[in-house]
Amino acid sequence: YAPAADAAKVVDGLGTRWETLKIAVKPYPSCRYSHAAIDGIRDLGHAQAISPEEVKEVMVGLPEPGWKIIGDPEPAKQSPASVVDGQFSMAFCAAVALRTGGLAWDDYARHLGDRDTLALCKRIRTRIDPKAQADFPAEMSASVCITTARGEFETYVRVPKGEPANFLTASELRAKFDGLVGPYLPRERADALARGLLALDKARDIGAVLRLASPEVRSAEPRLAAGFRLARGRQANSTR
């Protein structure tokens, strides 16, 4: 939104500075403000073997701009009625993460009408966290406190997964890819497309790679996407 164009910036750092390396990749199909909290819930759930049934309350602390978008007003955020509602509801994202160990695109269809998930949403609270506010806007951080009969379990995630400083592993990136293309491409074509994209710098015919991305006409029965999951018992990857 500069008042005038600056032609010099078009070639500034050309060939030496790669802006794409500064781009984050969202592991979850929800508002980015929710991601640090989802990471924290995944980490605590794995480390403490927390089951959704034992959760009395989850308190998520957010920077104020994020809280206004995904935490307020609390009654509405605890009762999402559509996919967009769910994407911008910290309560819904947290409830799904508690129940599944993550959040994938198919979870909206599975959980928006699920009574147990919606009941769990009522136990998710949000607040403005001073520490997260101090880290903002450099980071979109979050604090998480899960209260159970066994006690309280807390964590603070400063850099959410997917940021350049905490990027997805190769397997996590592939899991996101599979979750998105799974309903539209057969496995063999998805594998070929993934190989083509990863070797794009060596491609002689970019059109051949793009043609692999054309969806086929599939049967009416949807295929569930793999999504981005934290398998129970697998070591969680985190750099905080």
Q: PLM features: residue spans?
A:
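Terminal-appendage/accessory-domain detector
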Residues: 1-240
